[in-house]
Amino acid sequence: GHLLKAQSIDHYSSLDPSQPIEFKGNCLRYADKEIILGPKTFFVDGQLSDREVADNPYVFNSFNKAAANFSAGTEAEPMIVYLAPYVYWIDDPDDPAIRVGKDGREPFGLVVKCPYLHIIGLNSHPENTVLASSRGQTQGAVGNFTMFDFWGDGLLVKDLTMGNFCIVDLEYPLKKELSRKKRMSAITQAHVAYCHGDKIVADNVHFISRLNMNPLNGAKRILFNNCHMESTDDALTGPGVYLDCTLQFYGQKPFWRSDMGGAVFLNWD
């Protein structure tokens, strides 16, 4: 079958032993819940070697490799990807090539066309599971580099950080070697994510950038629950409901526009 070799499982432990993940090859155990892996249930841990993931079609060591194998979810059966604590680079920050957009659009780190996609960190601290990029306008890109371009209704992101660390240091608490200094200190447009769809939810997610941060901009309706955002100007999503969120503004004008449905802030600071 598709079980990992026993020796690679025996020694498995996630980067945060205080919230253990038991990995048994074809299933996970986390927070007293058993998760059976399969065609619509993937597990990703950047610690795993290529050899360790080679024999398992549902286990990956990079988010991008997992994304290449997503199949469309439905409301009843979403496409779920579970992420162990790590820093997952959506775009290689060490690649010297300049990113250029196609068809008059911004350059993207990753375009994901998958309805009812659930991206879930296996740790209650969002800063421990990071989806990262480090490019912006004139900084490794022509145009406003945007880490993600999501297409599809029903996107859920939970218990993780989405950050464009072009002008913000990435300080990773669980393993110093995974931290990275910002690309530059001048403020430039460095986007996090666009989203084309409805019924989008972000739960306990940190969105980090500065100018034009764009946390899942473009959604018809989106709920941000218990999220934290750092940005300057023209950055927040217009038709969003922000519930129990913390917002750190480093500028005067956080919205570009909010006339598509109005933004609602409940119990935020």
Residue locations for each model-derived region?
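Surface-exposed cleft-lining segments at the edges of enzyme active sites
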Residues: 52, 188-189
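Feature marks extracellular polysaccharide-active and adherence modules
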Residues: 45, 84, 120-122, 151, ...
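Sequence/structural signature of small/polar-enriched beta-strand/turn repeats
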Residues: 137, 170, 242, 259-265
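Solenoid scaffold repeats with emphasis on beta-solenoid/beta-helix
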Residues: 42, 81, 117, 129, ...
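Right-handed parallel beta-helix/beta-spiral solenoid domain characteristic of secreted/periplasmic
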Residues: 58, 90, 95-96, 103-104, ...
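Extracellular "leader-to-stem" segments immediately downstream of a signal peptide or signal-anchor
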Residues: 1-80, 99-106, 127, 136-138, ...
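Glycine-rich beta-solenoid repeat tracts in large extracellular/virion proteins
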Residues: 108-112, 131-132, 146-151, 169-171, ...
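Short, T/G/N/S-enriched strand-turn elements that build extracellular solenoid repeat scaffolds
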Residues: 33, 61-74, 89-113, 213-219, ...
